[in-house]
Amino acid sequence: TQEGTEKAIAAFKEHCSEQQVVCRRIMHEQKNPFAAMISEARYNDLTIFGLRSIFDYGFTSDPDKAIIKLMTLGVRPILAVADNYRPIKKVLIAYSGSMESAKAIRHFLHLNPWPEVTLHVVHFKEGQEREPFLLKDAAEFCEAHGFEVKTEMVEGQARSNLLPFARENNADLIVMGNSVNKALLQRLMGDTVLETIKSADLPLFLSQ
């Protein structure tokens, strides 16, 4: 309802003020909300939207392409929040070893939205051997930014194993990254990120 929306906005603005975070309300009366989101993203550090609303409430006729469009046009990082609030204490970082995946870690560490969290960096592999220093380097980078971190190598596909692994390890947030190349992003989003968004009951931090 409109009343509920106004209360939520007021509470959000009050919380931002308490944390000394700049917050302003912008209203756009137009049929294409994505045009407004893309425009405003140029001058903001983080974009937040409901994890399921983009799929469940007719926000767009093609959610898959909409999320791809947001990320390829520069709306990132994105925090996709779940329906139910949960304190963020344990963060699971899905790390592929790619430059894009490393950038996602860097964006999260630099933004530092939850300073007291512990980090769990996981790499999913499908039989191939990875460099032994892959997770070691990622862990050292996180530790250099003052975070407590542990690492784990898991056999299997990220698409089918990421969410079960996150739940088993009591993660409160998942950090993921993808390439900005549109063709590659469409393939990767279809394989992992979109599948995760559609199925997740955890908030997601999505970055380049």
Listing of model-derived features with the role each one plays in the protein:
Residues 14-15, 80, 107-111, 141, ...:
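A generic secondary-structure signal
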Residues 1-3, 119-143:
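Acidic, proline/glycine-rich short linear motifs
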Residues 62-66, 134, 188-193:
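Charged helix-capping and loop-helix junction motifs
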Residues 99-106, 129-134, 157:
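A general structural motif
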Residues 37-40, 45-115, 120-122, 199-208:
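Intrinsically disordered or low-complexity boundary/linker segments at protein termini
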Residues 3-47, 144-174, 179-188, 194, ...:
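Structural beta-alpha unit
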Residues 55-57, 126-131, 182-183:
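Short, small-residue-enriched loops and turns at beta-alpha junctions
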